[in-house]
Amino acid sequence: MKNIILNPKKSEQSNYIYNGPIDKYTFGAPQLNRGFFNMKCNNPQILTEYYMMYNRYFSGWNYNYENNKDEKIEELAPGKTIFFLSRNQDSPNLYHGMGDVLGTISMMELFNITEDNVQIVFLENMYLKDDPYYEIYKKVLSRGGEPIFIKNLKQKYHISFAIHVPLNWDSPVFIRDINNTYCKHPTKTYKKLHELIDKYLDIPNFVDSFISDNETFYYPKLIIDRHNSGVKFTKCLTIIWRKVWPKNRTEQNRLMQNGPELADKLASVLPKNILVRLVNTACLPMNEQISLMKKTDYLVGIHGAGLTLGIFLPLSSIYHEILHKETWNVVLFLSMMSGHNCYFDIVKGTDNKTNGFEYVSFDENDFVEKVIKHMKENNYFQ
């Protein structure tokens, strides 16, 4: 994307001014992103909205509507691209996940940002010292220096990227540019992203969630019978199943209660050559999770349960993400970047004010019909 300017010269900055207040809702609270930012962008080639970030082109000053005067913006790390990592203000105990890490790495690739030119910034009150992904983030983003911690956002700061702000669906230019830039060369992009992952995530024994569960793999009995009968499997459908969170986490969301039932149903209706398995990836070391993805052709899972590792799926594979209420575009972005197909399915769930959102059982028959439809669209039955 040659037309994207990360650090416009002073003479160019009049076209790229963030013209709204910066407060606690600017970062986090992703449900507020639609229509919340007032960005001036006179050049249609310059995107103001991307997945997991907003470009903010500052002239060094921010106009404050409350007191009708300009305010000086503090430069946290002059000359560097700042990645501001926040969490949803409503769920400050949420940990960062692999989607954030892979999304960040992809942003660096998308904008040709080198790690030595990055400065990572945390809000002190939204940083968890036991967050397992913090060390990975340090590895990915902090080669140019240690993270900076700021106490609050009352002071105005120059922020280049804000992680945890999802792509607005009303950004057709984003889709166009990603297609033109990456999807025309999926093999090249796929290889490049794998090189980046190998470079940054050289932590083979890192376990995603510290979950102890004996039921790591679940193969429907029907699948076992077929295997024992000599059936050769040519395709594999993997369901990521997290039925419990570790005790040190407060959230009980992103769970699939009826995983075995869904696996049994799929195994009973799909062609015999399609292997169906239910996997609790959270208790597997990272290298085993990646190995599993490389052997999967159709990946099903709840949003936030490890779907982003599907970036390691073989080319032209399928992501099928299960969500609640609205779409989050981690998987869409990464699937487009890596030459895969992506489908969403919004299901009903229950809201628990104490433990966050918990996914409940949903209609397996309806979901299976959609899986079959997507497989037919992608010639899986040939």
Feature-to-residue mapping (PLM):
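The feature primarily captures lumenal catalytic ectodomains
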Residues: M1-Q382
